[in-house]
């Protein structure tokens, strides 16, 4: 279970304190799939970072009784001066997983070939996303965080990613941030709309989109 209890997040800017999330509360059970809608700047990515544990909330509490992934295809945590393989080894140590399995899976799934042995700073954005997605799936989690529908290059590779995540791991929990109505209806059970840091919950996906589309 993930329990978000009266969570707020604010940052100190040059103009003073800016509140990004206001008193957000919701619960997510194991196996549940939730979609999050919101305009740019609504606080979606901030909420994802808080749920994953990358950042703490300013106030409130997030309780987790299941393992949670980092945002899929997020490559911001890679050390650019290290090779893809060195980054892989580092992640294996952090999560205490079998390096031989993760290496074999990543080599096959990412299709990066010898680039795995090159510094990540030389990768294109698509190559970084491939490595990040492969590592996200090589380390098994109870809940996967997806910030926007999978976009990692060619459609064949994207289809492979979707099969691994939504078919082979269809028993897992998912929090999906997306602007795509079709993706939400296909992959999620219900939806929440973030508007200027405030959360509105909907059990009916169409009503969530109706409200979302009414926003200025």
Curated annotation (Swiss-Prot):
User: Record's GO cellular component, any one?
Assistant: plasma membrane
**Cross-referenced Gene3D superfamilies:** P-loop containing nucleotide triphosphate hydrolases
User: What are the protein's GO molecular function terms?
Assistant: ABC-type capsular-polysaccharide transporter activity; ATP binding; ATP hydrolysis activity
Q: How does it sit in the membrane?
A: Peripheral membrane protein
Q: Does the keyword Iron apply?
A: no
Specify the domain of life of the species encoding this protein.
Bacteria
Q: What class of enzyme is it?
A: translocase
ABC transporter domain: which residues? Answer: 2-215
Which residues of the sequence carry a binding annotation for ATP?
38-45
What is the designated name of this protein? Capsule polysaccharide export ATP-binding protein CtrD
- Give the originating organism: Neisseria meningitidis serogroup B (strain ATCC BAA-335 / MC58)
- What gene is it encoded by? ctrD
